A protein has these predicted regions:
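An N-terminal hydrophobic leader/cap segment in hydrolases
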Residues: 2-47
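Broad phosphate/nucleotide-binding scaffolds in NTP-utilizing and phosphate-metabolizing enzymes
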Residues: 1-2, 119
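Alpha/beta-hydrolase superfamily serine-hydrolase fold, recognizing
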Residues: 32, 41-46, 52-245
Length: 245
């Protein structure tokens, strides 16, 4: 679909500048002003990872599911990892998305509140997600084939990296994953291998420059950027990976 002249001009204006984490977080938090959230069927849980309790918000498709004593036994579950450049966004900002996902699919949605950069560099957020996934996939009341791993943007990166890590460690293995415009690359420079970066990296709001800013916020070092758990596109062996959409 073509972009009209007025829209293109607005996008160009909004594309200027880099990432200000605090401003970006404040803008993202505006999504919390959702009058429908009082109707969402949800509950909060935590998973302990050794030095931190990772928060999870669980969304149910209906009232009956929310009130059941065994809320995960025999259920189909979507393990959701939100986007936001590893540095902005929270589960609370995705409540409408998660609630609608639960209602539309009839499945339970478990959204992970992983820790954010730059306060918590790679691999902290990834390990939070891995900890929750391991607890869910190895729980005696769940079956791996009933769980779908799903993430958007930075969450797609975390989902892809999590699956590679799960294969490497052998503790559990996702059977299927949905990667929604996943940020799996580590190079958004003018020399990028991808024409999409070179030709469309400017003037379209989320620019190549802003993506570089997000990567620098997430990475603890230059060496991190070469780690396939940081940029899954670098993984040379994709055997043993889940069915992927």
């Amino acid at each position: 679909m073509a972009i009209n002249i007025a829209t293109k001009a607005i996008l160009k204006i909004l594309s200027f500048g880099g990432i200000d984490v605090e401003v970006s977080r404040q803008l993202a938090d505006l999504k919390r002003l959702d009058p429908m959230k009082i109707f969402y069927k949800k509950m909060d849980l935590q998973v302990y990872n050794g030095d931190y309790e990772v928060p999870i918000r669980v969304f149910f498709p209906d009232e009956a599911s929310c009130l059941e004593k065994d809320q995960i036994k025999g259920r189909k579950i979507m393990l959701f990892l939100h986007g936001g450049g590893w540095a902005t966004e929270h589960v609370e900002n995705y409540e409408r998305v998660c609630s609608r996902m639960a209602q539309a699919t009839g499945q339970t949605v478990a959204a992970v509140e992983y820790r954010l950069a730059p306060e918590h560099k790679f691999p902290t957020g990834l390990m939070d997600c891995y900890t929750v996934a391991r607890a869910l996939y190895t729980h005696p009341d769940t079956k791996p084939e009933d769980i779908t791993l799903i993430g958007d943007s930075a969450g797609g990166n975390l989902a892809a990296a999590l699956s590679i890590m799960a294969r490497d460690r052998g503790e559990f293995m996702p059977k299927r994953q949905i990667l929604i415009y996943p940020a799996v690359n580590n190079d958004y420079s003018e020399k990028s291998l991808f024409s999409s970066v070179r030709e469309n990296g400017q003037d379209y709001l989320l620019t190549a420059g802003k993506l570089k800013d997000y990567i620098n916020l997430y990475a603890g070092s230059e060496e991190d950027k070469l780690n396939p758990y940081f940029a899954p596109i670098l993984e040379k062996d994709l055997s043993g990976q889940p069915d992927t959409l």
